[in-house]
From Swiss-Prot:
Bilayer-crossing regions: none
Modified residues (Phosphoserine): 77
Protein name: EF-hand calcium-binding domain-containing protein 5
Compositionally biased residues, Polar residues: 549-561
Species: Homo sapiens
Length: 1503
């Protein structure tokens, strides 16, 4: 104990001594270092080397001894600097005051304090030790550097450096172990030898032995035992050589370290070089992007909308050839066009998205940017044109009613088209053809169409366009030159010549046909008999270039999509002035529909015309001369002239006083009836006199003259019209040259001489011009304090609108969107803006409404506003009344409340209203339920029967009902929440991409949320649908299959089947059609439990089964809800819960049929596409889109890409369809233009032509879009274009029928036997059924003499004398074979037994089967009936050798109808045989990304 205590007492004293020594050593180190740095003497040059070495060695030894002494100091003697300072300075710390702390906290505080102090002292010592070691190392390096400076380097040691692999190891070993001691020893030995003069005195014996001396030296200086006293210059260099040589010794640490250092060095250099290259490439790319920025058209501030660049990048990244889809995730396209980018921001933004692109991809991006810059220029041009047309609509809408008359608009377009020059007409589209006229206005015969494959819609377009561009450039050059040469008075003279009217146009003007264009030479020059100028000659020659006698001159409507009028052979101009010739046909040959430029007449008139074309009169206005026309029977009886054309027919002094061709004088019943309808089709049918349509004489002449100057002299158009229109109008060689030289061309910041204002409404221009009536009426209701209680309900109704932003097509009027789209389609994409300006001025002068029309328009506007207001108010009343969301009201309850209106004074009037409405059938409980629509109809009739102003009466009734319906705040909140959940079910169906899975999920979600929030229950639910029992018919004809259930019950319920002979009340619900509620299932005895493993004592709960009904009140399934999983003992369903569950069942039924209606439409489209692909070959792809509500609140709708059909006819159906947003389609906005206006859009994108056709709902709004991509082709051939129209007409009719059936508006029609099989299969054959019915109706309208003429045609051929075989006789023989084969094929359908009869080979005996019963049999024939047994292969053999072109050339309507009837019957028979494998529903699984389908069809032979 004493020893330990004494030792502990000695430790502080020893530590104090060590600290004192440490201070001394620190002071001495500093002094020695200071002296060493200052006491290094300069070595003289002539000083002896050995003495210098010895002095240096002595100094180094002394310094190293000092270092050794420092190493002996204990590390523990280092003292903290704070401790040293505390020995001199005393600091008094302030005391801490602690309030209300626990004892545990007080005890823990000192512990943390001493630990903290200990850690601080330890850290300070460690830092001091580390710093001391660093200082020592630095001092040692300084001493070595000094020694190197003092000692001269002996380069002889470098001779030891030899990397020879043979001696490398040995050399390294010697240099490292032996030579550092051996060399100084030899040197020392030689010095001694020299001192003792052993070599000089060789004969004198000496005791000095050099070997012994060397050995003694080596022993004394063994490096393992003796510290290195110092090194000479030779040794130091040898050491360096040793270190360098060790690097080359393999498998050593130095070698590996050196390799690592070398790799690191190389990687660093490579990284630096790569960084330099990256920076250089980035700068080069930025410079290229800055140069490319100048090719874009900019706003006045020199900026581009950011969304445009985002669209460009997205389109580039989505190119499948580049495989850059991952880059699209980084793009977040903005909704607004307000954010703009200047040149630097443009460069930085694009650079940030293309950092990892290769050089090849960057070059492709530059090309894409250049192309997009040109496309954006066209987009701005189209935007300027659309704004121009929108302002025109507002100008023509004098009453601000929001719509213009459709017939008047089309008539003005026809008038503008007829009086346009030939060159300008080549840029316009024909307003008498589709898509300007609707399918309902086209007869079936016309749709079978022109089969001439050699005729093209855009025949000769390139030539006309190039001539026009050449002329524009020539005129621009000549104008520029003439401006430099003309005198100051010359412009005035030119103006006088241009503006001088002609009182009497010369006769030679009248000789120019309208086909050549009513081009005029200067009137002053005509009167003086002067020749036209060179510029005018060039223009006139370009227009009349085909000559005075042309064949099939094409009237082209637009550079993109023109439905042309292919005219018949025309006589010369002089012959036309004297006598109008008609076409002389031989035999039954028929003139092409597209050549005639108008539609066919009725079937009876067509038949007579085909037989006597050559015998018709050749007077002006004859039917053969004008071309066949499409008109109804009443229109054929009496043709009335249009009042709009009267001024131009009466006046010869105006610019329209020229004689136009027969085609323009009689332009067909469609335009004639359309123009006549302007005079007679008012609301009340009152005629409109011509004085309201005609412009006063002087005013008419002035605007006609202005129009003439603008349209007939439109060769000059504008001074700065670009010489090249859109690049994809030229042939491939020209296109390549243009694209090659395009980057070299300077980019003007003007579009046809006009600067861009910076306004860009391509994505959201509806916000500026379009207003929707329901929103305006809702705002008016919000401002009316009488309906305060309904405001919140109406807001919910407006927010839950299905799809916003669409306009409905009604066939009577155009709203702004439709009007703008119509004019844009008429003008086309390539017409200069001056043409649009001319059309705008023409419309402003020509669109004149009578006072009666204006009043009718205002009445219609107010009526529409009243209907919208009425619908909103009545829907709000219905929802307030139906507070539980059941979806119906009791008629008895409604009547009881209505009869109290005005204290019962209007009771009799309300009873009269009930006589005009058909109420639904009473339910089993004698309860008549009114849906929302039926309730609105009932209240509308009540309002119409009450006395007073209709608007005031409506408001009074609504206010009475609103005040009579007292609802508590809790009921209102519950109603609002339930409405929201019900809306989510319907929204799930609309946004599901044609899938039922989201509908099931939202249905169960609504049930569970309501049970939890308003019933405090835990429920289970499942949906079972009725199916036909094919496997076990003895258990019943139908069964219930559980198709969906809540997640907890999936393993027990999903896909299970309930038969009629099993327990359960579900079939009772199906039979009775009313809900059944079982409060306590354990006591019922007829409940089937799916989970048989459950203990019988746990069967405690309620069960509710609800019927699922369609629009015809037919039951198709059961919705079951139970509370077996609820832990509460009392868990019965309350009345308000049952009513809400009925509402859920009702909304689910609507959503279910909504999805299936879209599914059936897809089947119809697939069938139509299959038929179209069998008869056409120019269509590259067909993409089908459906319209869905947008998930964003500020957007209107989105498009879902449902399926894509490739060039081979294989349809790829997407299970999870991609979503297309408007903001990402700036360069492909034609899809949204079509959906907005519900009109056909003809557009081009990326060098490909698109024909976009809407699929309309029964209301006229677009429910989908079909995008026909025809690739690089400018337009389809006439034959294929007619086939496209036929396909779309049938598809649209089938869609109307499907939608009407699902909504309950029309009753289902089962015409063919195959339609009774299944719903999906029925949708697949609906396309062919409609085509079959149309043909049967057309055949039924034929005259019996039409069939007899076929037999007489054969008889006349037989009675002809034998003549040599020439082309005419061969043609007649081919026609006879055609007639016989088609009639034999038809006979085989009804008399299949003749196949084995010898009479069938004799035509004379087969003739007897062509009798009066044949037409009846054809019109009543069902090719899908089970009793029909026909040899389809034999029938195909008879018609296989005859193409559609051959049938068309024959020109007999009977043969044509029968030919198509045979093909459709054959296709239906094949579908019937392939029923199970041919049509597969694409629903409802979403496990795969896509599936493929190809519908069976019957192709028509093409030759």
């Amino acid at each position: 104990m004493n020893e330990s205590a004494s030792q502990e007492e000695l430790r502080p004293a020893q530590e104090n001594r060590k600290e004192d020594k440490e201070r001394k050593w620190n002071l001495t180190e500093v002094k020695e270092l200071h002296e060493t740095l200052q006491s290094v003497p300069d070595v003289p040059v002539k000083e002896d080397t050995n003495s210098v070495v010895e002095k240096a060695m002595d100094e180094i030894k002394s310094q190293e001894l000092n270092l050794e002494g420092q190493r002996k100091i204990s590390p523990g003697s280092i003292k903290d600097s704070k401790t040293e300072a505390s020995g001199n300075i005393a600091i008094r710390k302030s005391a801490k005051v602690i309030f209300a702390l626990d004892e545990t906290e007080l005890k823990s505080k000192p512990e943390h304090t001493w630990k903290k102090n200990l850690f601080e002292r330890m850290e300070a010592r460690a830092q001091a030790m580390q710093q001391k070691i660093i200082d020592k190392e630095n001092l040692k390096k300084e001493l070595e550097k000094k020694a190197e400076k003092k000692l001269p380097r002996d380069n002889l040691a470098k001779e030891w450096f030899n990397t020879d692999s043979m001696t490398l190891n040995n050399t390294a070993y010697l240099l490292d172990k032996l030579l550092p001691t051996l060399v100084p020893g030899v040197e020392n030995m030689l010095t001694q030898v020299e001192k003792k003069k052993v070599l000089t005195e060789a004969d004198t014996p000496s005791k000095f032995d050099p070997i012994n001396y060397l050995g003694e030296y080596l022993i004394r200086n063994n490096p393992n035992y003796i510290k290195d006293p110092g090194m000479s210059g030779y040794q130091r260099l040898m050491k360096e050589v040793t270190e360098d040589l060790k690097i080359y010794v393999p498998d050593t640490i130095c070698n590996r370290v050196s390799k690592m250092k070398e790799n690191v060095k190389q990687n660093r250099k490579q990284r630096e070089s790569i960084d330099k290259i990256i920076v250089k490439v980035a700068n080069t790319r930025k410079q290229a992007l800055q140069e490319q920025f100048d090719e874009w058209i900019l706003d006045p501030k020199g900026m581009i909308p950011k969304s445009v660049i985002q669209n460009v990048l997205q389109e580039f990244f989505q190119n499948p050839d580049f495989k850059l889809g991952s880059h699209c995730k980084q793009l977040d396209i903005t909704d607004s066009t307000e954010p703009r980018l200047n040149k630097m921001e443009f460069t930085e933004y694009i650079s940030s998205h293309i950092k990892d692109l290769k050089s090849e991809m960057f070059e492709e991006l530059l090309k894409h940017l250049c192309h997009s810059a040109d496309e954006f220029r066209e987009v701005i041009k189209a935007d300027m044109r659309r704004q121009m047309f929108a302002e025109l609509f507002l100008h023509c809408d004098h009453g601000k009613v929001g719509f213009l008359d459709r017939q008047r608009t089309l008539a003005l377009l026809e008038l503008f088209y007829d009086h346009s020059s030939q060159m300008l007409r080549s840029l316009l589209r024909n307003p008498r053809q589709w898509p300007f006229i609707e399918f309902e206005e086209i007869n079936l015969t016309e749709l079978w169409g022109d089969m001439d494959n050699q005729k093209h819609i855009y025949e000769g377009f390139d030539k006309v366009l190039l001539e026009m561009n050449t002329l524009l450039s020539a005129n621009h050059a000549s104008k520029t030159q003439s401006k430099l040469l003309e005198s100051p008075d010359q412009p005035k003279l030119n103006e006088q010549r241009t503006s001088t009217p002609s009182p009497n146009p010369p006769e030679q003007q009248r000789g120019v046909t309208a086909e050549q264009g009513p081009q005029r030479i200067s009137i002053e020059e005509q009167q003086q008999g002067k020749k036209p100028t060179a510029e005018q000659e060039l223009y006139i020659e370009s227009v009349i270039e085909p000559g005075t006698h042309t064949e099939s001159t094409l009237e082209q409507g637009s550079s993109r999509r023109l439905l042309t009028e292919q005219e018949t052979h025309r006589e010369s101009t002089t012959e036309q002035g004297q006598h109008k010739g008609s076409i002389e046909g031989q035999g039954p040959r028929r003139v092409s529909v597209s050549e005639q430029g108008s539609s066919r007449e009725s079937v009876a008139e067509q038949g007579s015309r085909r037989e006597s074309i050559a015998e018709q009169d050749r007077h002006k206005g004859s039917v053969a001369e004008q071309g066949s026309r499409r008109m109804s029977a009443a229109e054929q009886g009496s043709l009335r002239e249009s009042v709009i054309e009267e001024p131009y027919q009466k006046s010869e002094q105006g610019p329209y006083g020229e004689i136009i061709s027969e085609e323009q004088e009689d332009i067909g019943s469609t335009s004639q009836s359309r123009k006549d309808s302007i005079l007679k089709s008012t609301k009340y049918g009152e005629p409109i006199t011509s004085e309201y349509i005609e412009v006063p004489l002087q005013e008419k002449r002035s605007w006609e003259q202005t129009y003439e100057e603008e349209i007939f002299l439109s060769s000059e158009l504008q001074e700065e019209v670009p010489t090249l229109s859109r690049k994809d109008h030229f042939p491939e060689t020209t296109k390549k040259e243009v694209q090659k030289d395009k980057p070299c061309e300077p980019k003007s910041q003007k579009i046809e001489g006009k600067s861009w204002s910076g306004e860009f409404f391509t994505c959201n221009w509806k916000m500026k011009y379009v207003t929707f009536e329901d929103e305006e009426q809702a705002n008016l209701i919000y401002g009316n304090s009488r309906f305060t209680d309904l405001h919140s309900i109406i807001r919910n109704i407006q927010s839950c609108k299905e799809v916003k932003g669409r306009t409905a097509f009604n066939g009577v009027s155009f709203n702004l969107l439709q009007f703008v789209q119509l004019l844009e389609t008429f003008v086309g994409e390539d017409a200069p803006l001056s043409v649009s300006e001319t059309l705008t001025s023409f419309f402003k002068e020509g669109y004149v409404e009578t006072e009666q029309e204006k009043m009718n328009a205002l009445e219609q506007f107010s009526q529409n506003a009243f209907q919208v207001r009425q619908r909103l108010l009545l829907e709000a009343i219905f929802q307030k009344w139906d507070s539980d969301g059941s979806g119906f009201l009791d008629l008895k309850e409604v009547d009881e409340l209505l009869y109290t209106y005005k204290e019962g004074m209007e009771k009799e009037s309300m009873k009269k209203a009930k006589l005009h409405i058909q109420f639904p059938k009473p339910h089993p409980g004698h309860e008549v339920r009114l849906s929302s629509k039926q309730f609105q109809n009932y209240i509308e009739l009540v309002v119409s029967e009450l006395r007073g102003n209709e608007d005031q009466v409506l408001e009074s009734v609504v206010e009475f009902l609103m005040n009579a319906l007292e609802r508590s705040h809790i009921e209102s909140l519950r109603n609002s929440a339930r409405r929201k959940w019900l809306h989510q079910i319907q929204c799930a169906a609309e946004t599901s991409g044609v899938s039922l899975e989201p509908v099931y999920s939202e249905t169960f979600k609504a049930l569970m949320q309501d049970a939890e929030a308003h019933g405090n229950k835990k429920i289970s639910a499942h949906i079972s649908l009725l199916e036909e029992n094919l496997l076990l018919p003895e258990k019943g004809n139908v069964l219930l299959r559980n198709v969906a259930c809540t997640l907890d019950d999936a393993q027990f319920v999903l896909n299970r089947v309930l038969y009629r002979d099993m327990k359960g009340i579900s079939f009772t619900v199906v039979d009775e059609g009313k809900p059944i509620h079982v409060p306590q299932v354990q006591y019922h005895g007829n409940i089937f439990f799916w989970n048989q493993s459950r203990n019988k004592h746990d069967y405690n709960g309620s069960f509710l089964a609800l019927p699922l009904q369609d629009a015809y009140m037919r039951i198709f399934g059961v919705l079951a809800v139970d509370t077996l999983r609820d832990p509460h003992e009392i868990n019965i369903f309350l009345p308000h819960e049952i009513r809400f569950y009925q509402g859920v069942a009702n909304v689910f039924s609507t959503a279910y049929h909504y999805v299936h209606s879209r599914e059936h439409i897809l089947h119809i489209v697939i069938t139509g596409i299959g038929w179209l692909y069998d008869v056409t070959s120019s269509i590259t792809s067909i993409t089908t889109y459906f319209v869905e509500p947008s998930p964003a609140q500020d957007s209107d709708y989105v498009l879902r890409n449902m399926m894509v059909t490739g060039q081979l006819g294989l349809t790829e159906i997407h299970k999870n369809p991609p979503t297309i947003h408007r903001k990402s389609c700036i360069f492909r906005d034609f899809l949204f233009k079509c959906t907005d206006s519900s009109e056909v859009v003809l557009a081009s994108a990326c060098g490909e032509t698109h024909i976009v056709v809407p699929l309309r709902e029964r209301t006229g709004e677009a429910l989908g879009v079909l995008d026909f991509n025809i690739g690089q082709n400018r337009m389809l051939l006439c034959q294929e274009y007619k086939d496209l129209q036929k396909m779309m007409k049938v598809v649209q009719v089938a869609c109307y029928e499907i939608l009407g059936e699902f909504s309950g508006e029309i009753k289902k029609k089962y015409i063919l036997e195959i339609e009774n099989v299944r719903e999906v299969q029925r949708a697949g054959i609906l396309f062919f059924r409609i085509m079959l019915l149309e043909l049967q109706e057309s055949i039924q309208l034929l005259n019996s003499m039409e069939f007899v003429s076929l037999l007489l045609y054969d008889h006349t051929l037989v009675t002809e004398p034998n003549s040599p075989q020439d082309s005419k006789s061969m043609e007649l023989e081919a026609n006879v074979k055609l007639v016989r084969d088609i009639l034999k094929a038809v006979i085989l359908f009804f008399h299949p037994e003749l196949e084995f009869s010898s009479d069938f080979g004799s035509w004379d005996k087969c003739k007897f089967y062509v009798n009066k019963y044949l037409v009846n049999n054809i019109c009543a024939f069902d090719p899908t009936a089970k009793h029909v047994e026909v040899n389809v292969q034999l029938i195909d053999e008879y018609i296989r050798d005859h193409s559609r072109t051959e049938v068309w050339k024959f020109g007999n309507v009977v043969i044509e109808h029968l030919y198509h009837w045979i093909h459709i019957c054959s296709a239906l028979m094949k579908i019937t045989k392939q029923l199970n494998s041919g049509i597969t529903p694409p629903l409802p699984s979403k496990t795969d990304n896509y599936m493929y389908a190809k519908m069976p069809g019957e192709g028509l032979q093409e030759k």
